[in-house]
Amino acid sequence: MAKCDMKMPEDFLLKISKLDSNFDSVADTVLQAGGEVVLKKVKSNLSSVIGRGTKFKSRTTGELEGALGLSPSKLNRDGNHDIKVGFAEPRSDGGSNAKLANILEYGKRGQPAKPFLKPAKTASRQECIDAMTKALDEEVEKL
C-alpha cells in the first residue's frame, strides 16, 4: 500500500499555531476583508449591466442594486467558515431579488443574458486572495 505525507510550509504552520483560540474571530475578519473586495466588484458589474441593451425604456428602481450585500461569516455543517455575497429578500413589491438577478445573469426567452456575477468572481479572485492574505498577516501580527 502506498503512503504519502503532505507537509505544510513552516511559516504558515507558525501563523496558524499563533492563532490558537482566536481562530474564529480571525477567520471572520479575514473573510470579511475578502468579501468586501468581491462585493465591490459585483456592485460595479451589476450597475453596468442594469438597463443596458434593452428594447424598451428601462424601468429600473435601483432596488436590486440596493439589496446587494455581504452576509455575516458563519460556520457551515462541514466546519468551514463561509461568507456570502447576495441579495436581501424580499423586494418591496413582494418579488424575489434572487429571481431578478438570475434572469439578468442567465437571460430568458426574449432577453439575452447579461452576466455580472461570474465575471466578478473571476476578475476579483486574485485581489480577494491578496486582501485576505494581508488581513491574516495583520491579525497574526496583533497576537
Positions of predicted regions on the chain:
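Short, Lys/Arg-rich flexible segments
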Residues: M1-K84, S92-D93, A98-L143
